[in-house]
């Protein structure tokens, strides 16, 4: 795959990334920190995932896993670090993190819908999905997920960890 502008095969790159994270998931590994800075191209222009410092074993999630993986909450923060933290994780995880930091689920959902690039720059303008629709779907998810309602974060992670890296790639 040639990474020069106009030559890059985005489809092939995405297939490769999804296969890579699918393989990791089958092995029980969640990277949990996927962003452009952690994807490098090797000498053959093959994408390689690096920096597994935040990775965890999805088959062994417990309270210690969560205690070592709480991320800095970045609502209202415009630093580059906060941008990646805010955008690379699934919105459901950001809601959980916000509740852990004292926000209500409703406030967190509103911050996410109006703050995450996927909603502002892709869902609404490209896909035509109104922000109100995205907000309602997140609210509905949060109201119907047993582990979310119970604030049982270990159960929440055990249920949803397999989607964490997929969200980051998407």
Where are these regions (language model features)?
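Catalytic-loop of the protein kinase fold
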Residues: 25-42
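Short C-lobe core helix of eukaryotic-like protein kinase catalytic domains
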Residues: 15-26
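Conserved structural core of kinase catalytic domains
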Residues: 1-12
